[in-house]
Amino acid sequence: MSCWTLVQQDFLEAPSVDALKTSLESKNDYVKISAMKTILRVVINGDSLPSILMHVIRFVMPSRNKELKKLLYYYWEVCPKYNNDGTMKQEMILACNSFRNDLQHPNEFIRGATLRFLCKLKEPELLDPLIPTVRQCLEHRHAYVRKNAILAVFSIYQVSNHLIPDAASLAEDFLAAESEGTCKRNALIVLFTIDPEKAKAWLLANFEQIPSLNASSLLVIIEFIRKVVLTKADGLEKLRFQSLLVSLTATNNSSVVFEAATSVINVFPDAESLKLAASRLLALADREADNNAKLIMLDRISQLAARDKSILEDLITDVIPFLSSSDFDVCEKAISIIMGLVSSRNVEDILNHFQKELTKSNGETEKDDGRRRALTKAIHSCAINFPHTAATAIQYLLSHISDFQSKSASSVLSFIKEVMEKFPDLRSSNITKLLLSLKELRAGKIFRGVIWIAGEYCLTEDDIRVAWKSIRASLGEVPILASEEQLLKDVSNVPEDDLLIDISAPASTSRKVLPDGTYATESAVTSEALSAARLEAVKASKKPPLRTQILSGDYYLAAVLASALTKLVMRFARLSFDKERLNALKAEACLIMTSIIRVGQSKFVKYTIDDDSVERIMNCIRAIYSFEELPEFQTVFLDDMRKAFSSLVAQSDKRQKEADLLVNGSDAVQADELLNIRQFQRVIEEKQDLNFESDIIQATNDGMVVEDLASKLDHIVQLAGFTDPVYCEAYVKIQQFDIILDILLVNRTDTTLQNLSVDLATLGDLKVVERPPPMNLGPHAFKSVQATVKVSSTESAVIFGNIVYGGKASDEDKIVVLNGIPVNIIDYIKPAFIPESQFRSMWTEFEWENKVDISSNEDISLYDFLHKIMKKTNMNCLTPDASLRGDCGFLSANLYACSIFGEDALMSLSVEKSVSGPISGHVRIRSKTQGIALSLGAFV
C-alpha cells in the first residue's frame, strides 16, 4: 500500500527541463541525485515531465550508486507509463528489462529491493514478463529475497489474478518448504487472504505444530481465526480453533498472549473460555513492568466484568495484588474492577485487603494521599452497599482517623456522616470511638467534622455526657482568656536568661564612665522585647488540641463548636427533666462561647476573631437562653439542620444512581427489540466487509453522534463570496481530536484555473496535518477537497488561509483571501461530576484563574440564569439543586467540566439580583492551563 507525502515545490527555484536533462547527463553522481530529487518533487506535484523519461533510462539506470538506484525506483513508481491513447510507452520495455536483470542480480539485497518495488507496481503489462523470475526468487537461498518474493506474488495476484492463478498453491508449497519465521508469516498472510478454505485446511492439518511458530506468524493466525470463526467455520472447526486460541494464551510472548486472550473474549462467549482468558490477561499484566501495558489489560478485564461479572468473581484474588502497585492509575483501575466484582460472598475479604493497603499507604506525598482517598471511597461504597460490613469498616477508619491527612480525612468523615445517617444502630458505639480520637487530632478540618457529628448524632443522655467530657478535655481550662493570662503571669517569674529574647528588637542605650575615666555605651533590652518573649513562650507552650486550633485563628471551628454545644444543650433538654444539670450545661456552654470571643479579641491569638464568627457565636448564646420560651430555635437547630443533611444525602444517592444509569444505560433494551443472532444471518459473500462487532465497537467508541441534514447545515461556513473568482465553503466536522474540513471549490470564471491550491494556516494550538493537493479547475467546475487539522488543547484558535491560483511565475499568482473559521472549544468540553471535596482540593491546587464580571438586564430568575451559563459553557452544576431554588436575592454555585484531553475546568458563580435591578456578580474560572480558563471566560 503506497503512501505519498506532497512536498511543496518552490517555483522560483525550479529548473527548466533542459537544465534537468543537463544535470542527468553529468558524470557526477551527486548532481544526478539532486536532479532526481527535483524531478520527483515536480512529478508528485502534478507535472509529469514526459520528455525526461528517456534521459532517466540512458543516464540514471546504468548507475551503480545505491542512493541513485533508490531514487530511480521511486521514479518508476510515479512516472507516467502510458501514452495519451492508453498504450504502454515503448521506453517502459527498457525499464522492464532492467527490472528483470535486477531480479537476477547476484546481490540478494538488490533482488529484495526490486521485489519490494514490484509490490507497488499496478500495471499488468509490466508485471507479466517478470513472473517467471519472481517464481525463481521463491527458492532463493537468502530469506530476505524469499520473504519479499512471496509478497510480490501476493501483490501481482491482487493486481490481476490471471497472471498468477496458482498463487494459493504457491503459498501452500512455500509454507511446506519454508523454515524462516518472517517468510512463514508472509506466506500465511498470502494464503489466508487469497484462499481462506485452503488456509483453514492447512491450519487443521498442522494443528500440533502451530504453537511452536514464531510470534509474528502466530499473530497472523490469531487474526485469521477471528475472521473464519465469525463467518465460515462450522461447529467442530470452531471447537478446534477455540482450543488452539486457548493454547496460545499459554505462550511466552506477551503480544501473542494478549491477542489470543482478547480473541477468546470477543469470539467465544462460554464462561470457561472467558474465565481462562481473563486469568491469562491478569497473569500477563502482573508480569509486565510497563504500567501502560498493565492499564490496557486491566481495561479489558473491566470491559469483561461489565459484560458478566459472575464469570470473574472467582478471579478477584488475582486483581487484588494490583492494589500494591506503585502507579496510582493502576491501583485506581484495580479498585474499579474489584468494586464491580464485589458481592455478599467476598465483600468481607475485600474489605480486609482494602484495610491492609490503607495501613501500608502511610506516605506523605500527594499520590499517597490520593491512594488513601481512593481506598477510603471503596470502603465507603462497600459499607453502604453491604450494610452488614458497615460496622467493621467504620471501626477501622475511626481507629486510624488521626493517621490521615486533611484531604483523605475529609473522605473518611464524609463516610462516617453517611453511615450515621443511614444506619441508626451504629451511632452510639461509633460516636464514643470518634470522640475518643479528639485528643489525637491535629487538623482543623477533621476537628470540625468530628464536632459536627457529635452535635448532630448524640441522641442519648449518655452520648451527650461523653461528647461534653471529650470536648471539655480537648478544650482545656475555661475561661480561656483568664487561664492564658495566668499562664503569662507564671511565665513572668521565669528568669530572663531562660527566655528567648529577640536581639533584633530596639534597645535603650546610655553613656557610662569607666573606672579609667573613658566613656562607654551601655545597652539594655527594653521591657517591650521582654514582654514579647514572655508572650511567645505562652503561645508556644503545650495546650490541648482544640484549644490550640482556636488560638491559632481557626474561628470557623469555633463557630462549629458553638453550634454543636447549642445542639447538645437543646437535645439534653428534650431528653431529660434534670433542670439542675440542664442549667449547668447551659452555663458552661455560654462560658465556653464567651471565652472564645474574648480570647479572640486578645493578644494571645494569632489572628483577631472576625465579625461573622462573633455574630454566629452570639446567635448560639441567644438561642441557648431563649429556646425554652421560643421552640422555633429547637426546630431550626435540631430538626431543620438534620432534614437539610438528610436531603443532601438523598440527593447524592439520586445523582449516583443517575450516573450509574448513564454508564449502564446502553445495556438496557426494550422488550420488543429484535435479537441479533449471528448464526441466523445470511452468509457473508466474499470480498464483502466483515462485520466484527466487538472490534468495531472498541475502535469507534468515541461518542460520535450521527448528524442529520439540518445539523450538518449548521456547521457549514462560507469562506469566500459569490463575487470572488473562486467560491469556497467548508463543512466543519469534529471527530475526536481532529477537525475535518470538507471544502467545496467552485470556479466562477470562464477560464481554467491552473495550479489552484488551498493554503491553510492556524492561530493557536492547532496543526494542519493534511492539506488539499494542488489542482486544475475548469470553467464553472467545482471540486471537493478535504483538510485535517489536529487539535491539541482546548484553547481558542482560528483556522484561516487563502486560495492561490495562476501561472508558475510568482507575479502571475492570484489570491483569494478566505474568512477565518473560529474553533469552538465547547465541542471539546463535556459536563462531568466530581465530589465537592475533590472540587475544593482542585480549586486550591489550580493556579490559573480568570475572573469575569457579570452584568445582565435579562428579566429571569437567578436559577434560570445559572442554567443559561451551564448551557453556554457546557458545564455541570455540583451544588445541590435544593440549595439553588427559591426567591433569594443571591446565588452561589460550583460548576465543573472535563475536556476530551483530560483537562479539568472549575467555575465558581456568584451573582445577585435586586427587586428591579440587573443581575450582577462575577464568575471565577480555574484550570491547570491558562488557555481553557480564558476560553471559557469568553463564553460567559
Curated annotation (Swiss-Prot):
Cellular component GO terms held in the UniProt record: COPI vesicle coat; COPII-coated ER to Golgi transport vesicle; cytosol; Golgi membrane
Share an example GO biological-process annotation for this protein: intra-Golgi vesicle-mediated transport
InterPro entries assigned = ARM-like, ARM-type_fold, Clathrin/coatomer_adapt-like_N, Coatomer_bsu_C, COPB1, COPB1_appendage_platform_dom
Specify the protein's topology with respect to the membrane: Peripheral membrane protein
Q: Which portions of this protein are annotated as coiled-coil regions?
A: none
Superkingdom of origin: Eukaryota
Q: Name one Pfam family in it.
A: Coatomer_b_Cpla
Its main subcellular localisation, reduced to a broad class, is: cytoplasm
- Where is this protein localized, as stated in its record? Cytoplasm; Golgi apparatus membrane; Cytoplasmic vesicle, COPI-coated vesicle membrane
Which of UniProt's keywords are assigned here? Cytoplasm, Cytoplasmic vesicle, ER-Golgi transport, Golgi apparatus, Membrane, Protein transport, Repeat, Transport
Q: Where are the HEAT repeats?
A: 11-48, 90-125, 126-162, 310-347
Record GO terms (molecular function): structural molecule activity
Instruction: Describe the protein's quaternary organization and the partners it interacts with.
Output: Oligomeric complex that consists of at least the alpha, beta, beta', gamma, delta, epsilon and zeta subunits.
Summarize the protein's role: The coatomer is a cytosolic protein complex that binds to dilysine motifs and reversibly associates with Golgi non-clathrin-coated vesicles, which further mediate biosynthetic protein transport from the ER, via the Golgi up to the trans Golgi network. Coatomer complex is required for budding from Golgi membranes, and is essential for the retrograde Golgi-to-ER transport of dilysine-tagged proteins.
- Alphabetical list of PANTHER family matching this protein: COATOMER SUBUNIT BETA
Task: Supply the name of the protein.
Answer: Coatomer subunit beta
Q: Which organism encodes this protein?
A: Schizosaccharomyces pombe (strain 972 / ATCC 24843) (Fission yeast)
Report the gene name: sec26
